[in-house]
Amino acid sequence: MPLSYQHFRKLLLLDDEAGPLEEELPRLADEGLNRRVAEDLNLQLPNVSIPWTHKVGNFTGLYSSTLPVFNPNWQTPSFPDIHLHQDIINKCEQFVGPLTVNEKRRLKLSMPARFYPNSTKYLPLEKGIKPYYPDNVVNHYFQTRHYLHTLWQAGILYKRETTRSASFCGSPYSWEQELQHGAESFHQQSAGIFSRAPVGSSIQSKHQQSRLGLQPQKGLLARGNEGRSWSVRSRVHPTTWRSFGVEPSSSGHTNNFASKSASCLHQSAVRKAAYPTFSTTKRHSSSGHAVELHNISSSSAGSQSKGPVFSCWWLQFRNIEPCSEYCLSHLVSLLDDWGPCTEHGEHHIRIPRTPARVTGGVFLVDKNPHNTAESRLVVDFSQFSRGSTRVPWPKFAVPNLQSLTNLLSSNLSWLSLDVSAAFYHLPLHPAAMPHLLVGSSGLSRYVARLSSNSRILDHQHGTMQNLHDSCSRNLFDSLMLLYKTFGRKLHLYSHPIIMGFRKIPMGVGLSPFLLAQFTSAICSVVRRAFPHCLAFSYMDDVVLGAKSVQHLESLYTAVTNFLLSLGIHLNPNKTKRWGYSLHFMGYVIGSWGTLPQEHIVQKIKNCFRKLPVNRPIDWKVCQRIVGLLGFAAPFTQCGYPALMPLYACIQAKQAFTFSPTYKAFLSQQYSTLYPVARQRSGLCQVFADATPTGWGLVMGHQRMRGTFVAPLPIHTAELLAACFARSRSGAKLIGTDNSVVLSRKYTSFPWLLGCAANWILRGTSFVYVPSALNPADDPSRGRLGLYRPLIRLLFQPTTGRTSLYAVSPSVPSHLPVRVHFASPLHVAWRPP
């Protein structure tokens, strides 16, 4: 008869009417019993022929194909003008006195951040925007392109102008200015651009300098003959240097000319381009002047083309006969002025050689489950986490649950700060640009690739087979709708573009590491500037605690001003005041301890409601289930050991079948959650020790010993001794000389014993006693007569490796006291 849930509870000693612990507990270590229970509960059956279940409630396998939902009305979030101050270390030192070595090292890591992978795979531009939403291809293309444009305008992306130059908006950093083409320096650096020096000077002389910036007087067209050899022909129509990804610069300074001339048509992806004959367009430079642009007439186009070649796919629809009522020429003729073909940033810099390719695809999703009105850009740089091009990301300490509780469980008032676009605060060195490229191939190529009837551009000669191939009702309808949203920007966005990251992107394993180092260093500085405040952060989640609400408010003002002075942008609308129970990292932390947040508890209840019984569940779905249950495991009676059967089946990549008893057991475990309490420091009075055959305890001056029925593995024996010590003495502090017991991880013990021991030892702290000094050593060997004095062992709770309290160097005396207010606190508050 299968094991019922009541019997199972009794077996695990979870009920009160169990017999004496010294007899019952060793029985749970018996291998035979564990095997019989496992068979009864269906925990280790061989592979089953019933088909696996691949979905449980909302959980599907890790590589599930649940497509995200496209929202045609997504708003692109706005990004503040984020510019982290370059001399952040000096600013902190003015504020708080000398920084510690640790803080300096962490801050220097991200000023600027560097990223040098061993090898980088380049993908064609068509893969720049992922076709994630097959029914909304065009809409998704423009929304994504608009998002990238917004990031570029906010100074978060570089725009690739030529193979070796890029432009960006916002304030430059010193490592970027060093690369800038000045009027003079350009000629010395131009060796990489022109093969013969005189070309540079001849170009310069042919251009008059006016207050409008650089204007072509008699045009020149530098044309790629083969590879990078250059020739200059002067009997050509008035021109500007236009080619793919490089179009005349809009800032009225000499150095822009570098980007124009350097651009010329020598990139392979670009060879298809020169410009059609239309009117001269006026357009405004970033410095506010109008710059005249003249276009190349089609007769002067590229060297090997057969017939006229146009680069601007969009504007060609202006002068041709419509092919049908859905021809794009109807849309293009709506406006006379579609604006420039490309825009240029305020600053131009030299960059390492960057091909006209991308290294990762992008697509849009909802900003978060609670905010579906705004979009979020997902960047897939997974090539750096997979296969031969894998980069070993740096490891960093994440505070574990006990450390977090020791640190934050107190009677303080709390608030949490919201750092807006935290990742985009940290600057990347321009040398990383060639590895982190995103972009798009332009609308014509994108549409051609996705529609079966149209042919992609003829690469060999760069001719467009037939403009009307791309006209279709779907495209026309989508573009007419988008015209209402984007207006003349449709033209700008229909051009190809390549962008590199100027701030750290979210899709690279380096970013979380850098952000964690950065915010922890800043919090360390804040804690020393305001000694009676507790500031703590994990990634972009920053919390402040103080003894009273008034105190907290004045701290909030002071800390916010300090962070703003460093160039860190906070979102004041999202500041949350928690009172005495802090919500942080998915937990609720109060003076009583820590519990999981309510939404997680609800998720667990729903999970159990939908768990099928006696049906094999795909191990990938089990991973999802274990992920959720594992988060709340420390708050249950049996903890992680209860989930061991699930872990085992995931490791074996086998399906798992929940028996009614095992499901009832887990469901009961998670129905009552117990808080994890803060550890207290204290003097250890109770010691436990064991040998394979016997155990011994010392409680103050009382000593006990006992023997096991059969010899046991030493770790198991030590664990049993610790359980006896806890149940006999009730002490929350026990001395032991076994490292496995000290670690409080009971997952490697026989399953039933692990579950029972977890419940008995819940909330117990252990202190390490070397065997030679352990008073319980003699009793465990059966020698009660010998008496050795108790050693004074002090237990200090740890805050793990969260490196909280930087040793503060002496602050120079002339610095004023930071916080002036009637504080109820006359002494600096120390951590609990």
Curated annotation (Swiss-Prot):
Feature type site, description Priming of reverse-transcription by covalently linking the first nucleotide of the (-)DNA: Y63
Positions with a binding annotation for Mg(2+): D418, D540, D541
Region of interest: Spacer: 178-335
Keyword Hydrolase: yes
Regulation: Activated by host HSP70 and HSP40 in vitro to be able to bind the epsilon loop of the pgRNA. Because deletion of the RNase H region renders the protein partly chaperone-independent, the chaperones may be needed indirectly to relieve occlusion of the RNA-binding site by this domain. Inhibited by several reverse-transcriptase inhibitors: Lamivudine, Adefovir and Entecavir.
MF annotations from Gene Ontology: DNA binding; DNA-directed DNA polymerase activity; metal ion binding; RNA-directed DNA polymerase activity; RNA-DNA hybrid ribonuclease activity
Residue intervals of the Reverse transcriptase domain: 346-589
Catalytic activity reported: DNA(n) + a 2'-deoxyribonucleoside 5'-triphosphate = DNA(n+1) + diphosphate; Endonucleolytic cleavage to 5'-phosphomonoester
One Pfam match: DNA_pol_viral_C
Region described as Polymerase/reverse transcriptase domain (RT): 336-679
One GO BP: DNA replication
Note: Hepadnaviral virions contain probably just one P protein molecule per particle.
Note on domains (UniProt): Terminal protein domain (TP) is hepadnavirus-specific. Spacer domain is highly variable and separates the TP and RT domains. Polymerase/reverse-transcriptase domain (RT) and ribonuclease H domain (RH) are similar to retrovirus reverse transcriptase/RNase H. The polymerase/reverse transcriptase (RT) and ribonuclease H (RH) domains are structured in five subdomains: finger, palm, thumb, connection and RNase H. Within the palm subdomain, the 'primer grip' region is thought to be involved in the positioning of the primer terminus for accommodating the incoming nucleotide. The RH domain stabilizes the association of RT with primer-template.
Chain's role: Multifunctional enzyme that converts the viral RNA genome into dsDNA in viral cytoplasmic capsids. This enzyme displays a DNA polymerase activity that can copy either DNA or RNA templates, and a ribonuclease H (RNase H) activity that cleaves the RNA strand of RNA-DNA heteroduplexes in a partially processive 3'- to 5'-endonucleasic mode. Neo-synthesized pregenomic RNA (pgRNA) are encapsidated together with the P protein, and reverse-transcribed inside the nucleocapsid.
Name listed for the protein in its UniProt record: Protein P
Organism for this UniProt entry: Chimpanzee hepatitis B virus (isolate United Kingdom/LSH/1988)
